[in-house]
Swiss-Prot record:
Pathway: Terpene metabolism; oleoresin biosynthesis; Secondary metabolite biosynthesis; terpenoid biosynthesis. Keywords: Chloroplast, Lyase, Magnesium, Metal-binding, Plastid, Transit peptide. InterPro entries: Isoprenoid_synthase_dom_sf, Terpene_cyclase-like_1_C, Terpene_cyclase_plant_C1, Terpene_synth_N, Terpene_synth_N_sf, Terpene_synthase-like, Terpene_synthase_metal-bd, Terpenoid_cyclase/PrenylTrfase. It catalyses: (2E)-geranyl diphosphate = (1S,5S)-beta-pinene + diphosphate; (2E)-geranyl diphosphate = (1S,5S)-alpha-pinene + diphosphate. Pfam families: Terpene_synth, Terpene_synth_C. Mg(2+) 3 binds at residue 530. The lineage of its organism: Eukaryota, Viridiplantae, Streptophyta, Embryophyta, Tracheophyta. A motif (DDXXD motif) lies at residues 378-382. GO terms for biological process: alpha-pinene metabolic process; diterpenoid biosynthetic process; green leaf volatile biosynthetic process; terpenoid biosynthetic process. This is (-)-beta-pinene synthase 1, chloroplastic. It is found in: Plastid, Chloroplast. GO terms for molecular function: magnesium ion binding; pinene synthase activity; terpene synthase activity.
Length: 627
């Protein structure tokens, strides 16, 4: 008999589903809590202890006499009062007008480079300007100037790199590493072999004995460049190992200063978890304290003032968007869904950290809503719902009709309508942006997503432990990356005609790798807590099944090697030359991957959002930059 049939069972026993999604693996606070569901639950608590930390899984009996599990998650950190009464003066016209004047003045700085820069520094000064406007988060205003500067640098690029200027006799590491990184990120075809010319006679990177600030900055830029590696680039791996070791040792020797803070930020966040708005916030502090800046004070002051002003002006936009998000959250009935995590503000913050252009409001709100829905569904399929209820819900989604709620349990009716209404609303927004109806395309993505949940429910119901390959293929879908990205992405002012969309969304390599890294990183961060909760299936357990005698350490080492390879593959899919797909079309899906990756940098930051994730909200959303 098929345990995942559509017809409901008459049994009232609860099958506790295991679904080791990266977004469903929970690192929990050490407490138990009874959660009221359906009016009058009769609590039965059980606590599972993990070796690394205390865990809690709450068991209760609801009004229908079904024993259910809840995760014991900490509550929503951001109530309506905190958000609704945020005030910022930076939405006023005077600040916007000052910003426009500063933009013009920075454009003049770009223009003056061709007149003022000597031929012994013209290349490095152009790279300095491009690098700094990007790190400060103000590059969207200077697209033409950036292209002109990089075209100029690339015209002097050689297989041995570049020097500081067009008349420089020899190349140097700082100019070449910074130039390589910047040119590659903008799609110029530059080879990593250029770095081989900075190794010694036995093929090793070596540091300069003098270790001046300029020498150290050269290694900082070498490290930053090494993170933009493509598959098979051994010299990039060597550069990363050397520069990371060097910079960690340097931090132990130099005093606290702007350079040490820059090194600390670069080492901590690297490239794949260095979200653009977070980088801007951190770099504003570093840039403003760098008294030995190689450029004149005039350039530094203008860039810094514009970066601070832009950062704060955007917070006034965020306040308006947060008010809209909270209305949706309340109107959708989300506060009444008490068994789930409420992380809508955190998801909005992640969206704001990767797409902070004012016109991308639809993306930011859509991403927050989609991720909230995914979290509710995740907790429902993973913990709270019975197999029979979940079969009904999955079938109802495929009907896509409000009347389908007639066959659902009461607690599922509101969840169904939240999915139905929000997906329809996002499709309407996408139609405005793309000029075509994408609802059926979006529905198909959600259906496949829920089918992957049900596959995992079938595995747990039958006690089946899949092979690693079988688990990963299904887990890439159940990770939720595709449904979190698809509709928000289509609301942007970036054209996604069908031939472009298939290179960004399913079945593209970019989408496959993005889903893979979310599954792999999620499992490596959360498998111990899942296992302590009685959920055995993960990348780690499946690998150990396929490789008898392998230890957990063996499995983790294998997965970390896989993750490193996936990251390089993502770099290639984003930046490969002559792909026929603009980098701008691929970048948002790539950046969504970076956002999710950030959430798993230290822990499961979606279940335990009260540490690093809370700090991200405070630093990028709630706290203005002092002018």
């Amino acid at each position: 008999m098929d345990l995942i049939s559509v017809l409901p069972s008459t049994s009232k026993s609860c099958v506790c589903l295991h679904k080791p999604l990266s977004s469903s693996t929970h690192k929990l606070k050490p407490f138990c809590r009874t959660i009221r569901i359906l009016g009058m639950p009769r609590p039965r608590k059980s606590v599972l202890m993990a070796s690394s930390m205390s865990m809690s899984v709450n068991t209760l009996v609801s009004d229908d006499d079904i024993q259910r599990r809840t995760g014991g998650y900490h509550s929503n950190l951001w109530n309506d009062d905190v958000i609704q009464f945020l005030s910022t003066p930076y939405g006023e016209l005077a600040y916007r007008e000052r910003g426009e004047r500063l933009i013009d003045e920075v454009r003049e700085i770009f223009s003056s480079m061709s007149l003022e820069d000597g031929e012994f520094s013209d290349l490095i000064q152009r790279l300095w300007m491009v690098d700094n406007v990007e790190r400060l988060g103000i590059d969207r205003h200077f697209k033409n100037e950036i292209k002109s500067a990089l075209d100029y640098v690339y015209s002097y690029w050689s297989e041995k790199g570049i020097g500081c200027g067009t008349k420089s006799i020899i190349t140097n590491l700082n100019s070449t590493a910074l130039g390589f990184r910047t040119l590659r990120l903008h799609g110029y075809p530059v080879s990593a072999d250029v770095l081989k010319h900075f190794r010694n006679q036995i093929g090793q990177f070596v540091s300069c004995p003098s270790e001046t600030e300029e020498d150290i900055r050269s290694i900082v830029n070498l490290y930053r460049a090494s993170l933009i590696a493509f598959p098979g680039e051994k010299v990039m791996e060597e550069a990363e190992r050397f520069s990371e070791k060097y910079l960690k040792e340097t931090l132990q020797k130099i005093p606290d200063c702007s350079l040490s803070r820059e090194i600390g930020d670069v080492l901590e966040h690297g490239w794949h978890t260095n979200l653009p708005r977070l980088e801007a916030r951190n770099y504003i502090d570093v840039f403003g304290q760098d008294t030995k800046n190689m450029e004149s004070n005039r350039k530094t002051e203008k860039l810094l003032e514009l970066a601070k002003l832009e950062f704060n002006i955007f917070q006034s936009i965020q306040k308006t968007e947060l008010e809209s998000l909270l209305r949706w959250w309340n109107d959708s009935g989300s506060p009444q869904i008490t068994f789930t995590r409420h992380r809508h503000v955190e998801y909005y913050t992640l969206a704001s950290c990767i797409a902070f252009e004012p016109q991308h409001s639809g993306f930011r709100l859509g991403f927050a809503k989609a991720c909230h829905i995914i979290t509710v569904l995740d907790d429902m399929y993973d913990l709270f719902g019975t197999v029979d209820e979940l079969k009904l819900f999955t079938a109802a989604i495929k009907r896509w009709d409000p009347s389908a709620t007639d066959c659902l349990p009461q607690y599922m009716k509101g969840i169904y309508m939240m999915v139905y209404n929000t997906v329809n609303e996002m499709s309407a927004e996408a139609q405005k942006a793309q000029g075509r109806d994408t609802l059926n395309y979006a529905r198909q993505a959600w259906e496949v997503y829920l089918d992957s949940y049900m596959q995992e429910a079938k595995w747990i119901a039958t006690g089946y432990l899949p092979t690693f390959e079988e688990y990963l293929e299904n887990g890439k879908v159940s990770s939720g990356h595709r449904v979190s990205a698809l509709q928000p992405m289509l609301t942007m002012d970036i054209p996604f005609p069908p031939h472009i969309l298939k290179e960004v969304d399913f079945p593209s390599n970019l989408n496959d790798l993005a889903c893979a890294i979310l599954r792999l990183r999620g499992d490596t961060r959360c498998y111990q807590e899942d296992r302590a909760r009685g959920e055995e299936t993960s990348c780690i357990s499946c690998y150990m099944k396929d490789n008898p005698g392998a230890t957990e350490e063996d499995a983790l080492n294998h997965l970390n090697v896989m993750i490193s390879g996936v990251i390089k593959g993502l770099n290639w899919e984003l930046l490969k030359p002559d792909s026929g797909v603009p980098i701008s079309s691929k970048k948002i899906n790539f950046d969504i991957t970076r956002a999710f990756h950030y959430g798993y940098k230290y822990r499961d930051g979606y279940s335990v959002s009260s540490v690093e994730t809370k700090s991200l909200v405070m630093r990028t959303l709630l706290e203005p930059v002092p002018l």
